[in-house]
């Protein structure tokens, strides 16, 4: 049984949710998101509240689908109302970044700078040369882009150098000891 799937979603003021067959569209002050949802889970709108009810046999697949669709819609509503942010820090001597147009240029210890194309639905800011702020209304796109940038030079366990999330803790390991 999906505990998340049965939770009620409250629609805040300024946000509208419309359903056209299998496509749910959410509009808010920050933008608009649309996603295709499975018809196996019924969406019931009562005033400013939304509930999801499974239709048909409630097996493991339906349980997962029920909770996932509810979480996806809640994330869409939060995204168009407040947006999502991720902050990355560059840790290491000489590691720096800059933004040129829609390209993020990273100098992270390789022989050449690494260019990363910023998707259109994501806003990237570089307040200083060791910080990257990623913002957008789609939680999955923001997280995927942040993971893609972090993957270029993920933190290593001996000195902690690399690209890390702002509040990420890296457990440092001890190096080899001589005889």
Swiss-Prot record:
Keywords: Ribonucleoprotein, Ribosomal protein, RNA-binding, rRNA-binding. InterPro entries: Ribosomal_uL6-like, Ribosomal_uL6-like_a/b-dom_sf, Ribosomal_uL6_a/b-dom, Ribosomal_uL6_bac-type, Ribosomal_uL6_CS. Belongs to the universal ribosomal protein uL6 family. This is Large ribosomal subunit protein uL6. HAMAP family: Ribosomal_uL6_B. It comes from Fructilactobacillus sanfranciscensis (Lactobacillus sanfranciscensis). Part of the 50S ribosomal subunit. Gene3D superfamilies: Ribosomal protein L6, alpha-beta domain. GO terms for cellular component: cytosolic large ribosomal subunit. GO terms for biological process: cytoplasmic translation. This protein binds to the 23S rRNA, and is important in its secondary structure. It is located near the subunit interface in the base of the L7/L12 stalk, and near the tRNA binding site of the peptidyltransferase center. One of its GO terms (molecular function) is structural constituent of ribosome. Pfam families: Ribosomal_L6. NCBIfam families: L6_bact. Induction: Expression is induced 2 fold by treatment at 45 MPa for 30 minutes.
């Amino acid at each position: 049984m999906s505990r998340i799937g049965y939770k009620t979603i409250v629609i805040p003021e300024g946000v509208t949710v419309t359903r056209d067959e299998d496509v749910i569209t959410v509009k808010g002050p920050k933008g608009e998101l649309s996603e295709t949802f499975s018809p196996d889970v019924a969406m019931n709108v009562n005033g400013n509240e939304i509930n999801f009810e499974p239709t048909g046999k409630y097996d493991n697949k339906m349980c997962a689908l029920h909770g996932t669709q509810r979480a996806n819609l809640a994330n869409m509503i939060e995204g168009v109302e407040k947006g999502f942010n991720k902050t990355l820090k560059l840790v290491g001597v000489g590691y720096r970044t800059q933004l040129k147009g829609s390209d993020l240029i990273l100098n992270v210890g390789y022989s050449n700078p690494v260019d990363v194309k910023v998707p259109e639905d994501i806003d990237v800011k570089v307040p200083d040369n060791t910080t990257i702020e990623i913002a957008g209304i789609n939680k999955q796109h923001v997280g995927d882009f942040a993971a893609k940038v972090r993957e270029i030079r993920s933190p290593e366990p001996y000195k902690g150098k690399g690209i890390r999330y702002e509040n990420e803790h890296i457990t440092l390991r001890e190096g080899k000891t001589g005889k």
